[in-house]
């Protein structure tokens, strides 16, 4: 078997570049990562110079995004196999899964990466097939449809800090967000049910637009809760409403009380 394959990693998140590089070294130690870059233009230059067999491309990158880069690569005589690194939901991914070399959904699990490597190896063994450009064009057309503005893509994970450490938190683990003066606190349930507090620099106003409104409700100007994590709702004698997330009691503004009608 030919083990001399090469690849590049393009992602604007240093933590994700490092994580993918480290994970690839474990599941495919023979693969040579010839470049790790932060945007599409750097990736294009690295690909033209090193002509790798595989390109791991984040779809959302500054300067030149992954999809635009793929269109440019498709004009090359021998384009690399592309593995898109994406935050798309599973239902959207299935629409183009058969045409892509593969995709990786953030945050990337080792088991999923192992499957990706096996699929890529199989595709590499069939290199030179006449329909490679046709498959790439079909993939790009479907990606353009999936990334159209009318199809909202909500956050699946959040990068947050805890002290000097950076963490990737699945939004499904988040209990609630609480705005402070210069940052937003993220309270998430980790491990054996222990609640951990993390910090993010994104404003609550910006964050709420990136969250699924069916899963997260802004109950107050300073707090957003995950609906499925609410244990109870009550009012005091003065008519003030509160929601409980575990043992935490959060106020509900009068404007937001209508969210709980019928509950």
UniProtKB/Swiss-Prot annotation:
<keyword id="KW-0902">Two-component regulatory system</keyword>
<protein>
    <recommendedName>
        <fullName>Uncharacterized response regulatory protein VPA0021</fullName>
    </recommendedName>
</protein>
<dbReference type="InterPro" id="IPR007492">
    <property type="entry name" value="LytTR_DNA-bd_dom"/>
</dbReference>
<keyword id="KW-0597">Phosphoprotein</keyword>
<keyword id="KW-0804">Transcription</keyword>
<dbReference type="GO" id="GO:0000976">
    <property type="term" value="F:transcription cis-regulatory region binding"/>
</dbReference>
<dbReference type="Pfam" id="PF00072">
    <property type="entry name" value="Response_reg"/>
</dbReference>
<dbReference type="InterPro" id="IPR011006">
    <property type="entry name" value="CheY-like_superfamily"/>
</dbReference>
<dbReference type="GO" id="GO:0032993">
    <property type="term" value="C:protein-DNA complex"/>
</dbReference>
<keyword id="KW-0805">Transcription regulation</keyword>
<dbReference type="GO" id="GO:0006355">
    <property type="term" value="P:regulation of DNA-templated transcription"/>
</dbReference>
<feature type="domain" description="Response regulatory">
    <location>
        <begin position="6"/>
        <end position="121"/>
    </location>
</feature>
<dbReference type="GO" id="GO:0000156">
    <property type="term" value="F:phosphorelay response regulator activity"/>
</dbReference>
<dbReference type="InterPro" id="IPR039420">
    <property type="entry name" value="WalR-like"/>
</dbReference>
<keyword id="KW-0238">DNA-binding</keyword>
<dbReference type="InterPro" id="IPR001789">
    <property type="entry name" value="Sig_transdc_resp-reg_receiver"/>
</dbReference>
<dbReference type="GO" id="GO:0005829">
    <property type="term" value="C:cytosol"/>
</dbReference>
<dbReference type="Pfam" id="PF04397">
    <property type="entry name" value="LytTR"/>
</dbReference>
<feature type="modified residue" description="4-aspartylphosphate">
    <location>
        <position position="58"/>
    </location>
</feature>
<feature type="domain" description="HTH LytTR-type">
    <location>
        <begin position="158"/>
        <end position="263"/>
    </location>
</feature>
């Amino acid at each position: 078997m030919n083990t001399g394959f090469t690849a590049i990693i393009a992602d604007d998140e240093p933590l994700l570049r490092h994580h993918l590089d480290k994970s690839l070294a474990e599941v495919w130690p023979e693969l040579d990562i010839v470049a790790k870059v932060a945007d599409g233009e750097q990736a294009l230059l690295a690909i033209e110079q090193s002509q790798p067999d595989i390109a791991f491309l984040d779809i959302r990158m500054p300067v030149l995004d992954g999809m635009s880069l793929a269109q440019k690569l498709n004009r090359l005589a021998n384009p690399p196999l592309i593995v898109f690194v994406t935050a798309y939901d599973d239902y959207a991914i299935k629409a183009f899964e058969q045409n892509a070399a593969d995709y990786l959904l953030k945050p990337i699990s080792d088991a999923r990466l192992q499957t990706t490597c096996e699929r890529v190896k199989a595709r590499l063994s069939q290199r030179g097939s006449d329909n490679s450009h046709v498959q790439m064009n079909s993939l790009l057309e479907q990606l353009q449809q999936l990334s159209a503005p009318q199809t909202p893509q909500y956050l699946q994970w959040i990068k947050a800090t805890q002290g000097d450490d950076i963490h990737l938190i699945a939004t499904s683990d988040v209990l609630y967000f609480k705005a402070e003066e210069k940052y937003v606190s993220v309270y998430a349930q980790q491990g054996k049910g222990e609640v951990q507090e993390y910090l993010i620099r994104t404003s609550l106003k910006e964050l709420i637009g990136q969250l699924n409104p069916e899963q997260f409700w802004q109950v107050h100007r300073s707090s957003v809760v995950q609906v499925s994590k609410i244990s109870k709702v009550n009012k005091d004698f003065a008519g003030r409403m509160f929601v409980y997330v575990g043992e935490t009691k959060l106020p509900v503004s009068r404007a937001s009380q209508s969210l709980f009608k019928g509950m």
